[in-house]
Amino acid sequence: MKIVAIGVAVAAALVSTSAYAQDIVQTFNGPRIELRAGWDNPDIRATIQDNRNRVSRSADKSGVTYGGEFGYDYSPNNKMVIGAYAGLEGSTTKACGELYGEDRLCVRAGRNITAGARVGAVLDDKFLIYGKGGYSNGRVTVDYQDYELILADENFGHNFDGFHVGAGIEAAVGSGVYGRLEYVYTKYGRISAETDALNASLKPTRQQVVYAMGVRF
């Protein structure tokens, strides 16, 4: 009887452990979709250089980022999660200032497209800490006016390719519902334009702290 009782207890423990591990897997497993919003801080460095002078200014201003993301996560065991994602964001950020003298340069952050992968570790059955990275494509609108009429006025938009890296923590808050907080740094490529007398370039970067709420299905 003692042997039977011990066997039943061991079997019950194994079933309980298996169910616990399965709950963890399901918590951070499968397709997901989310809405996100937070702090956005693009930093766009503009440089103008002629035969004698080189002037560089940085337009750094905070705003609000907003958008959505969808992805798929897979948990091969009860300790690790890997996944892929894609997202689309907008921004309210706009910065204006003097660049070269009697002029005005305004730079507005536009939409941002992201695609990448993430790897995380399950802290317990409700929390996931992760790192992420991937491709970014951000749009910037530039409005330049030269009040001395030395340079031509410009108004144009440009798409910048780049990459992003970040980290965050995610928490399961209900049946299929999760919330997460993350930091993301993005570095975009540079664009340049050249005339007979001047060379101009723009080089943007970006920092974000974002809170997201989503569902798994």
Regions found by a protein language model. Give the residues of each.
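Gram-negative outer-membrane beta-barrel domains
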Residues: 2-5, 12, 18-217
